[in-house]
Amino acid sequence: MMRTLQSAPSSPLAMPEIQFCLLPDACRPLLGKFYREHQSSMRAASKGQAWVAKQEEIIGALCLTPVADGYWLTGLFVAPPLRGNAVAQRLIDAALLPLSGPVWLFCHPDLQGFYRLAGFETAQRLPQALGERLMRYSRSKPLVALHREA
């Protein structure tokens, strides 16, 4: 599944087109390389879908792991020079478009505003597996659980 968005052609320095696509399993090592190159603590989920935003190379990524009757979104990361250009928002939208059901994520409380703009709201309930993870992860850092219907 490939989604392509083009930048505005008004400037000769306009950003090249960005493709949003499901990363084939055979290319999954590229996702780990992308995270490492940017010294991110993110890791590619071993199961589920890996989605990327690409120009000539990967510029953003996220993972969607099936859980209960929905998905758990992890690993959202955009290369620092491209932040502020709605790459993350467009990547989320492209990845969730073919899905149905709930999508959950955990984030630092400071990121709630960003995710609210992407259509997420505070999760009132979590699947048991995610509730247990949230409790475990919250021991070492502040986290909130958010939810969006795909």
Residue spans of the language-model regions?
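Acidic/histidine-enriched, beta-strand-rich ligand/metal-binding domains
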Residues: T74-G75, P81-R83, L117
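Conserved GNAT acetyl-CoA-binding A-motif
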Residues: L97-D110
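Conserved acetyl-CoA-binding loop-helix of GNAT-fold acetyltransferases
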Residues: V78, G84-L97
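Conserved beta-strand in the GNAT
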Residues: V52, E57-P66, G70-F77
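Short amphipathic alpha-helix that is part of the acyltransferase structural core
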Residues: M2-A44, V52, L126, K141-A150
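Conserved active-site alpha-helix within GNAT-family acetyltransferase domains
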Residues: P109-R136
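Accessory recognition modules or surfaces
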Residues: A88-Q89, R133-V144
